[in-house]
UniProtKB/Swiss-Prot annotation:
Protein's name according to its UniProt entry: Protein transport protein SEC22
Species annotation: Saccharomyces cerevisiae (strain ATCC 204508 / S288c)
Residue span(s) of domain Longin: 6-117
Listed InterPro entries: Longin-like_dom_sf, Longin_dom, Sec22, V_SNARE_CC
Function as written in the Swiss-Prot or TrEMBL entry: Nonessential SNARE involved in targeting and fusion of ER-derived transport vesicles with the Golgi complex as well as Golgi-derived retrograde transport vesicles with the ER.
SUPFAM superfamilies, A to Z: SNARE fusion complex, SNARE-like
Amino acid sequence: MIKSTLIYREDGLPLCTSVDNENDPSLFEQKQKVKIVVSRLTPQSATEATLESGSFEIHYLKKSMVYYFVICESGYPRNLAFSYLNDIAQEFEHSFANEYPKPTVRPYQFVNFDNFLQMTKKSYSDKKVQDNLDQLNQELVGVKQIMSKNIEDLLYRGDSLDKMSDMSSSLKETSKRYRKSAQKINFDLLISQYAPIVIVAFFFVFLFWWIFLK
């Protein structure tokens, strides 16, 4: 089930968070991890991703200048989590698009948006609604291929959410393989082109040595 929702501007300013059970230490820990993740995001980061974090999964979606995070219990359908994020992103954009970009915005200025978060969370927690939404999502878009990483790798082992980082690593590896193959092909080509000439030249040198110098 959905446990918590957090909304941040891309510069790291918290805009809103859902009112949750503050006595749950494990949920508090996940929220702290989200703060760290926000500080690591760059313009090259994936616009949507899933972070595996023990018995939780943290999903996020970026729309315009805003990151939307939802913390769910592990096992909650990912396509529903992203459908939920899309719903709240659309409503937040509709309600505050002219306000949140302003430099005068204060932290958690849009906390009243929690009313919509709670209502939407309740809908996505209803089993019948879950089943209907799940079926609808699969019919319309199927299960999307979304970047998934272990949050421990991200926070403590130097992993990255950058799309370009993964892509460039792959391209580097492909480039290395291509370069090695190209070198071998060029070498084989040189041999096939010049080997007969070298053999003939060697034959005449040997013949000259045999006739005149021996």
